[in-house]
């Protein structure tokens, strides 16, 4: 695992965008694994800027997203379908047929999990998997558990995740309690994993994921076993890692 120190959120975002843009330039038909949440927004903004300048072309890129809320319509402004279009897809020349996300409106968990796993197999190896990390160390919506989940599954969100998501909804009752998530095994098969983290609220998760024991109680810790994992974190997110760096 390689750790890259960033000055702040803007610097973190630019460093992550540099790695993704290099991948797309070197391999125009790259498969990009994409994440949602506040952490990668700046990365998407930078990629869009470079596209608008003519420096990047996404026409042959395929994308697969990590997760989607269970029972949430794509047009809901808090869905991850909406998020991705709002922050990235609608601003670049990506082919809509190459965009892949879980279908949160499929009530049959086994059916949707099997469908999305089949999609992931069909697109081939993910070249770069972009990840944020939750305060409790979750990646995707793989929450702390007694074992690592292998494939796509529907997960019950923990109270800490629900608490962190409250700010996006008008009331607590609207905050989703469940979500479809790509499994740990699938994330680990990506050729390169790129984690972005910013802020003191991510400091514990970064320390435990990078330097703690590998345990499903801290899902991000599995990335220590990946042969090409990069963590880009700002000073605040690295504030508890002083003894290790």
Language-model regions: role of each:
Residues 1-32:
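N-terminal glycine-/serine-/threonine-rich phosphate-binding loop
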Residues 124-149:
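Glycine-rich phosphate-binding loop
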Residues 33-37, 65, 102-103, 130-133, ...:
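Short beta-strand segments
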Residues 185, 189-245:
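ATP/nucleoside-binding phosphotransfer catalytic cores, i.e., glycine-rich phosphate-binding loops
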């Amino acid at each position: 695992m390689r750790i890259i120190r960033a000055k702040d959120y803007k610097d973190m975002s630019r460093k992550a965008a540099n790695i993704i843009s290099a991948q797309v330039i070197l391999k125009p038909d790259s498969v990009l694994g994409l994440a949602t949440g506040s952490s990668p927004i700046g990365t998407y903004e930078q990629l869009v800027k470079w596209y608008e300048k003519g420096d990047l072309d996404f026409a042959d890129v395929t994308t697969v997203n990590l997760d989607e809320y269970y029972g949430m319509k794509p047009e809901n402004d808090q869905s991850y379908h909406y998020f991705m279009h709002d922050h990235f897809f609608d601003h670049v020349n990506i082919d809509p047929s190459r965009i892949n996300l879980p279908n949160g409106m499929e009530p049959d968990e086994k059916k949707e999990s099997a469908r999305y796993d089949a999609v992931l197999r069909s697109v081939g190896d993910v070249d770069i998997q972009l990840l944020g990390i939750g305060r409790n160390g979750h990646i995707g919506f793989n929450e702390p558990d007694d074992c690592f989940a292998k494939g796509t599954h529907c997960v019950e969100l923990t109270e800490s995740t629900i608490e962190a998501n409250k700010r996006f909804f008008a009331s607590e009752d609207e905050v989703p309690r469940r979500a479809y998530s790509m499994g740990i095994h699938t994330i680990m098969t990506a050729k390169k994993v790129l984690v972005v983290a910013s802020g003191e609220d991510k400091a514990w998760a970064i320390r435990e994921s990078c330097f703690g024991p590998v345990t499903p109680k801290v899902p991000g810790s599995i990335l220590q076993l990946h042969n090409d994992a990069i963590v880009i974190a700002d000073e605040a997110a690295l504030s508890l890692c002083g003894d290790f760096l």
